[in-house]
A protein has these predicted regions:
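HotDog/MaoC-like acyl-thioester-processing domains
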Residues: 2-30, 83, 87-89, 100-163
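Acidic, divalent-cation-chelating loop motifs in proteins
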Residues: 38-40
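Active-site helix/loop of acyl-thioester processing domains in fatty-acid/polyketide metabolism
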Residues: 49-69
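Small beta-barrel nucleic-acid-binding modules, principally OB-folds
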Residues: 70-86
Length: 163
């Protein structure tokens, strides 16, 4: 599996044996260490932190495609997260991220949070992102070249996003 390195937290060039089977169909993986200050009163990873991690993974995905240079304007239209198992400090999560559906001006991102300590998926999430013109008002369609790069990346792990 080919991997892209755009930020320090994206895994790259690792052998398939290092990839948890649960994340084999995710073209990008974001490595996220848990920080002590992210715990809640019950010593679990606070629920809001999962959304921050998804944002970091999403930006890494777009950077890997050469689509996020800091000038791309996107807004979060919808998001959800299903918490399957508690996560506690110390821990490292691997976030698999992929495109579930690519619309004309939107992208539905899918995430799986894999615990290296528990060796299991501990949460899943989804986010609908809408791309805007630089003025932040008008929707901006994905170009043909961007769509082709995205589908080529997903195809490398045997995943085909819906359109």
């Amino acid at each position: 599996m080919e991997h892209f390195e755009q930020t320090a937290n994206l895994t790259s060039d690792r052998p398939d044996s290092d990839c948890p089977k649960e994340l084999a169909h995710y073209p990008i993986m974001h490595r996220q260490p848990i920080h002590w200050g992210e715990m809640d009163a019950f010593n679990h990873l606070n629920n809001v932190v999962y959304y921050r991690y998804a944002e970091s993974a999403r930006i890494g995905y777009l950077q890997a495609l050469g689509m996020f240079d800091g000038n791309m304007v996107t807004v979060l239209a919808q998001s959800s997260c299903q918490y399957l198992r508690p996560v506690t400090y110390p821990e490292t999560l691997l976030l698999g991220v992929r495109c579930q559906r690519l619309g004309t001006t939107s992208i539905v991102m899918e995430y799986s949070y894999y615990s290296t300590a528990q060796q299991a998926i501990v949460a899943t999430a989804e986010a609908v992102i809408v791309r805007l013109e630089s003025n932040g008002k008008d929707k901006l369609p994905w170009t043909k070249a961007e769509r082709e790069r995205l589908f080529a990346l997903e195809e490398k792990v045997g995943h085909v996003p819906k359109t």
